[in-house]
């Protein structure tokens, strides 16, 4: 049996109902402003506070809970990036090996060698006349 919701014809699981995913919640600017202000004061609101916010903003408690969870994750990411930026500003020459160009990594891994001075080689064209002179017999 084919699932009519999937034009590719994915088969249905027999006997088990499909779990419906809730649509993404889009918060208007007023909801965001209120939630952000509460987040500044309390990053982990309890159930009663979330319930009050949900009623005030015409949302479900679960949506408020998810908003706070996502906002804490965003704060964590921002702190991590800020820390990375501060480290780069303190030590601009020191980069994490994965942040370097592969050529830079190779240069750092190889021991520093002094380039050997090579003596210029005579070109074959210059040697040919000398060889011809040696092989020629005087007349």
Swiss-Prot record:
Gene Ontology MF terms in the entry: DNA binding; DNA-binding transcription factor activity, RNA polymerase II-specific
Record field: transmembrane: none
Gene Ontology CC terms: nucleoplasm; nucleus
Highest taxon listed in the record's lineage: Eukaryota
Key words, A-Z: Developmental protein, DNA-binding, Homeobox, Nucleus, Transcription, Transcription regulation
Protein localization: Nucleus
Main location: nucleus
Region (Disordered): 1-22, 78-139
DNA-binding region: 20-79
GO BP annotations listed: maternal-to-zygotic transition of gene expression
InterPro entries assigned to the protein according to its UniProt record, in alphabetical order: HD, Homeodomain-like_sf
Composition-biased stretches (Low complexity): 82-139
Classification via SMART domains: HOX
Family: Belongs to the paired homeobox family.
Functional summary from the UniProt entry: Transcription factor required for zygotic genome activation (ZGA), a critical event in early embryonic development during which the developmental control passes from maternally provided mRNAs to the expression of the zygotic genome after fertilization. Protein produced from maternal transcripts that binds and activates expression of key ZGA marker genes, such as NANOGNB, ZSCAN4, DUXB, KLF5 and DPPA3. Binds to regulatory DNA sequences containing a 5'-TAATCC-3' sequence motif.
The name this protein goes by in its record: Tetra-peptide repeat homeobox-like protein
Species annotation: Homo sapiens
Gene behind the chain: TPRXL
């Amino acid at each position: 049996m084919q699932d009519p919701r999937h034009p590719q014809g994915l088969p249905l699981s027999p006997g088990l109902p499909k779990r419906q995913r809730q649509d993404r919640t889009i918060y208007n600017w007023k909801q965001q402003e209120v939630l952000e202000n509460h987040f500044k004061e309390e990053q982990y609101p309890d159930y009663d506070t979330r319930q009050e916010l949900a009623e005030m903003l015409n949302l479900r408690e679960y949506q408020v809970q998810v908003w706070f969870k996502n906002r804490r994750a965003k704060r964590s990411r921002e702190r991590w990036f800020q820390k990375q930026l501060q480290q780069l500003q303190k030590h601009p020459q020191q980069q994490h090996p994965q942040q370097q160009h592969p050529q830079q990594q190779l240069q750092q891994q190889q021991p520093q060698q002094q380039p050997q001075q090579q003596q210029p080689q005579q070109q074959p064209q210059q040697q040919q006349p000398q060889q011809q002179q040696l092989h020629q017999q005087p007349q």
